[in-house]
Amino acid sequence: DASYPFLIQEKYRAGYFTHYAGEGTVRSAKLSYKGEEIDLCLCPTHAHFSQEGKTRILTLDPVTIEFNDLTVKLQTKEYFEEGSSNIKIERHILEMSNPDAEVTLNEYMVACYGTTEYSEDMSNIKLRIDGPEVKTIDYAYKCREEGVVGATEVSAVVPEIETRVSMTASDSAAEGYVKEGYAFSPMFTLGYKKTISDKEVFATWLNLAKAN
């Protein structure tokens, strides 16, 4: 084995370009507008650190996203609180070339379980959405997907490493979803989708806990 068990790993199952474009383990967001889609993990930028009390803040320089007939200027801030198992990620829409336009923001996490380049058996993983209704998927590599508008949490439990990973969102109107992988792309996906407009801020939290 090459590392401790991981869900997202920099060397193995690594990022956007691993195996299948967009199917490596990654925590990112996609912006969609009129059939076009751009992933923020493909937008290089710089960042700087600051600290407020016990919270360290990573502020990324704004990136400009160009669609055919719309330009969006977006800034990301990430918050790491000492002693916490939660990471807060904020997306700020700073400017739009058309202030009345609306884009779809898809905050997502793609992950799998393993210690090497190849994932372990994920058959015991359980995906779940909590909210106005509860939906679950018992992992069977069938490429299934479920979604709930107004979801309070989307989560995955990995019994082999006694881990529960989840995402929550700042807007109760956002749609939470979970996606199951398949044999040649076994990773699972947790995410939230929301329509967002000029000057709006949308926050999500990536949460890690011990599963009993």
Task: List where the protein language model places each region.
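Compositionally biased, intrinsically disordered low-complexity regions
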Residues: F17, G24-V26, E37, T55, ...
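Beta-strand-rich recognition/accessory modules
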Residues: P99-T104, Y108-V110, I129-D130, I137-N212
